[in-house]
Design a protein with these regions (language model features):
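C-terminal beta-signal and adjacent terminal beta-strands/loops
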Residues: 143, 232, 244-259, 281-322
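Repeated loop/turn-to-beta-strand initiation elements of outer-membrane beta-barrel proteins
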Residues: 22-25, 72-75, 129-133, 184-189, ...
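Gram-negative outer-membrane beta-barrel transporters
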Residues: 138-141, 159-252
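Extracellular loop and loop/strand-boundary signature of outer-membrane beta-barrel proteins
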Residues: 1-3, 44-52, 104-109, 158-165, ...
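Outer-membrane beta-barrel translocator domains and adjoining extracellular loop/strand segments
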Residues: 1, 37-46, 88-94, 101-102, ...
Length: 322
């Protein structure tokens, strides 16, 4: 059964803008008070007689500076702190079945919020109205990132759960391009391209058995593309979208058992796949009719494990589905 839960979030924000000629600086800070109450059920559907409370008091500063060379060129530098607080099911001991993973999932009472410090530096070029070329460098520092992992229930049954890593660092480069296609005679058509290269590394406690690896859920690259048609007079709009992500860890492996009888569950990876979506819409007065088709290629979703042996890595396909 699902847990009984209540959530209270109160927040306040103060900020100010400081224009200094070509340089504009905006800074602010947000305060949040969050109180979560959780009453879980056991696997036998028995309700706990007491509530568990999670209370957080957090400040989130942010600074955004933009230096405008002229109407078409500018540099940006920004910093901000954000948070990823556990969801109710992530801290509940109740077990639920995840159909995508084809496995049971159980929360972790001791899960902590993850705090992220974000730093970005970028250059932006606006060739004309609605067009953009930007290149940015980014760095993200994670404290207590929340990750999927495995645990044991009922003796030998493996189920998914959540844990906090000590920390993680992500950094990389991102390119964003938006271009109208009038210059090749394709009026009302536009193209967008977005790509990122990311290096990710998790930090571990001294003496931990884990090796260097990317953060769970983080891909080494991301590719997005879009082909758009917009005709304001007729009200017709269409979009063809493409997406691809690199191989990423979907479940963090761990060592189980004693030192004399230790079993290592390898990391589980979601393999790259291509996804294409199509949508067409028509405006009729104040109404809009829209038809959308997702995942036109219908490529299989594959999860694999790579186990290291004395002879090298052994690849094993653990699950595939469409």
């Amino acid at each position: 059964a699902l847990p009984i839960c209540n959530n209270l979030l109160s927040a306040g924000y103060v900020g100010g803008n400081l224009p200094l000629g070509k340089l504009n600086v905006y800074a602010g800070v947000r305060f949040e008070y969050n109180r979560m109450e959780l009453v879980s059920h056991t696997q036998k559907n028995e309700e706990s007689p007491t509530s568990v409370f999670y209370t957080y008091d957090d400040f989130f500063p942010s600074v955004n500076a933009a230096y405008r060379l002229n109407d078409k060129h500018q540099f940006r530098l920004s910093y901000g702190r954000t948070v990823n607080r556990p969801e109710f099911r992530e801290v509940s001991s109740s077990v639920y079945y995840d159909f995508d993973l084809a496995s049971n999932v159980q929360g972790n009472y001791n899960l902590k919020p993850a705090y992220i410090d974000n730093l970005d530096f970028g250059y932006e070029f606006y060739p004309s109205s609605g067009e953009l070329i930007s290149v940015s460098l980014f760095y993200k520092r994670f404290k207590n990132p929340i990750e999927w992992t495995y645990t044991v229930s009922g003796g030998t049954d493996l189920i998914y759960s959540y844990v906090n890593a000590k920390g993680a660092d992500n950094y990389g480069v991102e390119v964003d391009i938006r271009k109208n296609l009038d210059f090749i005679g394709m009026r009302n058509f536009s193209l967008s391209l977005n790509g990122a290269l990311i290096k990710s590394k998790v930090k571990f406690e001294p003496g931990a058995k884990e090796k260097d690896r990317p953060m769970q859920g983080q891909s080494p690259y991301l590719i997005n593309a879009g082909f758009f048609y917009q005709h304001a007079d007729s009200g017709w709009n269409a979009a063809l979208l493409y997406n691809r992500i690199g191989k990423r860890i979907i479940g963090v492996g761990r060592s189980l058992g004693t030192a004399d009888n230790e079993v290592r569950v390898p990391d589980s990876y979601e393999m790259p796949r291509n996804a294409v979506d199509l949508s067409v819409s028509k405006k009729i007065g104040n109404l809009e009719i829209k038809v959308a088709v997702r995942d036109l290629l219908a490529e299989k979703v594959s999860f694999k494990q790579f186990e290291e042996t004395r002879h090298g890595k052994v690849e094993q396909i653990t699950r595939q589905y469409k």
